[in-house]
C-alpha cells in the first residue's frame, strides 16, 4: 500500500477516488474509464506540480520515505554474483552496514551500504541504518580488501547518522568514523559514493569520501538533522523547517556549493514511486563515471581525491 506524505494529501485523495472507481467498475461492468482517465491525469499533474517546487523540509520527508529503495535493493539489482562479507575481525558483526564483493557490469567491485531495513523486524535488525564502530571497521576491512585486489569501491549511503549510544562510544565511535574516512580517502582504487536517501553527519561521510559523490534528486546530505539543529539553535525542534532551509542540505544546494559531483534524477513523485527505474538511473550514473576513474593510476586517484576534499576546506575559509 502506497504511503503518502503530508504535502501529497490532495494527490492521495484523488488516487483513493480512482481506486474506488476501479473497484466499482469491475464487478458490475460499469464503464468508468473516462472518469478514471480524467482523475488520473489530474492526479499526475498535481503530483508533478508538487514535486517541481519542493521545499528543503519537504525533501527531507521524501528522503526519509519508508518505501524508497534501500541499499540492499541497489545491491541486489546492480551487483551480480554478490557475496556478502560480515564482521570487523575485531569485535563483531554490525548489520547496519552491509557489504561484500561482486560484479558491476562484469567489473569486479567491492560494495558497501548503510541499510535501514524495510519493515519493523528488519529495521530493528539493521538498527535503522545507524552503524556502530564495528560497522565502520567492517567498511574499512572491505575498502582495504578492494585496495589489495584492485577492485573499485561503490558505496550506497542512507543513514540518519552513526549510532549515538553509550555502547558505541565505549568502543570508539569517533575513531572508527575518522579511520573510515581516512581509509576511504587513501584507497588506491576508484571510489564512487551515492547518497540514496538521507546522508546524516559523520555516519554518512565515513562512506562518502569518494572520487565521485552523487546524490539522488530528492536525497539530503547534512552535518546534522534539521530537528537536532533546531533544538540546538532555537531550543525548539518545531523550527526544523527553518533549519532545513539554513543547512543547505538538498542535492541542488550541494551541487551549487561544489560538494557533490552529480545529481541523479528521480521519477515524478520520488524514488518510492518507481524504485526499479531509480535503481537503473543510479546504475547508469555509476557506469558513466567509472571508466574515467579506471583509467587513472592509483597515485593519481588518491592525490586527486585528497585534493578534492582539502579544497572544500580551503574554499570555505577563503
Swiss-Prot record:
Which keywords does UniProt give here?
ATP-binding, Cytoplasm, Fatty acid biosynthesis, Fatty acid metabolism, Lipid biosynthesis, Lipid metabolism, Nucleotide-binding, Transferase
Protein's GO biological process: fatty acid biosynthetic process; malonyl-CoA biosynthetic process
- What does the entry list under GO cellular component? acetyl-CoA carboxylase complex
- The regions listed as transmembrane in this protein's record are none
Q: What Gene3D superfamilies does the entry give?
A: 2-enoyl-CoA Hydratase, Chain A, domain 1
Checking InterPro entries in the record gives:
Acetyl_CoA_COase_a_su (IPR001095), ClpP/crotonase-like_dom_sf (IPR029045), COA_CT_C (IPR011763)
Record flagged with keyword Nucleotide-binding: yes
* Similarity-based family: Belongs to the AccA family.
> Partners and quaternary state?
Acetyl-CoA carboxylase is a heterohexamer composed of biotin carboxyl carrier protein (AccB), biotin carboxylase (AccC) and two subunits each of ACCase subunit alpha (AccA) and ACCase subunit beta (AccD).
Query: What name does the UniProt record give this protein?
Result: Acetyl-coenzyme A carboxylase carboxyl transferase subunit alpha
Q: Which organism is it from?
A: Gluconacetobacter diazotrophicus (strain ATCC 49037 / DSM 5601 / CCUG 37298 / CIP 103539 / LMG 7603 / PAl5)
Amino acid at each position: 500500500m502506497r504511503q503518502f506524505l503530508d504535502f501529497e494529501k490532495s494527490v492521495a485523495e484523488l488516487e483513493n477516488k480512482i481506486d474506488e472507481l476501479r473497484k466499482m467498475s469491475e464487478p458490475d461492468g460499469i464503464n468508468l474509464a473516462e472518469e478514471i482517465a480524467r482523475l488520473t491525469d489530474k492526479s499526475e499533474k498535481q503530483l508533478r506540480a508538487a514535486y517541481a517546487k519542493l521545499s528543503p523540509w519537504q525533501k527531507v520527508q521524501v528522503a526519509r520515505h519508508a518505501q524508497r529503495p534501500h541499499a540492499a535493493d541497489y545491491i541486489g539489482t546492480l551487483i551480480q554474483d554478490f557475496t556478502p562479507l560480515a564482521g570487523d575481525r575485531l569485535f563483531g558483526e554490525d548489520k547496519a552496514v552491509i557489504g561484500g564483493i561482486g560484479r558491476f557490469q562484469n567489473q569486479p567491485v567491492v560494495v558497501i551500504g548503510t541499510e535501514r531495513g524495510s519493515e519493523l523486524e528488519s529495521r530493528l535488525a539493521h538498527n535503522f541504518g545507524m552503524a556502530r564502530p564495528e560497522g565502520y571497521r567492517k567498511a574499512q576491512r572491505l575498502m582495504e580488501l578492494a585496495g589489495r585486489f584492485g577492485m573499485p569501491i561503490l558505496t550506497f549511503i542512507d543513514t540518519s547518522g552513526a549510532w549515538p549510544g553509550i555502547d558505541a562510544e565505549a568502543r570508539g565511535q569517533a575513531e572508527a568514523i575518522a579511520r573510515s574516512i581516512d581509509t576511504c580517502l587513501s584507497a588506491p582504487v576508484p571510489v564512487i559514493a551515492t547518497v540514496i536517501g538521507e546522508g546524516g553527519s559523520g555516519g554518512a561521510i565515513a562512506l562518502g569520501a569518494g572520487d565521485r559523490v552523487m546524490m539522488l534528486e530528492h536525497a539530503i546530505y547534512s552535518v546534522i538533522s534539521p530537528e537536532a539543529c533546531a533544538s540546538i539553535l532555537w531550543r525548539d525542534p518545531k523550527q526544523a523547517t527553518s533549519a532545513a532551509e539554513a543547512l543547505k542540505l538538498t542535492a541542488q544546494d550541494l551541487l551549487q556549493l561544489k560538494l557533490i559531483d552529480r545529481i541523479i534524477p528521480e521519477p515524478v513523485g520520488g524514488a518510492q514511486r518507481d524504485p526499479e527505474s531509480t535503481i537503473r538511473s543510479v546504475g547508469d550514473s555509476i557506469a558513466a563515471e567509472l571508466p574515467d576513474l579506471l583509467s587513472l593510476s592509483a597515485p593519481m586517484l588518491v592525490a586527486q581525491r585528497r585534493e578534492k576534499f582539502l579544497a572544500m576546506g580551503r574554499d570555505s575559509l577563503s
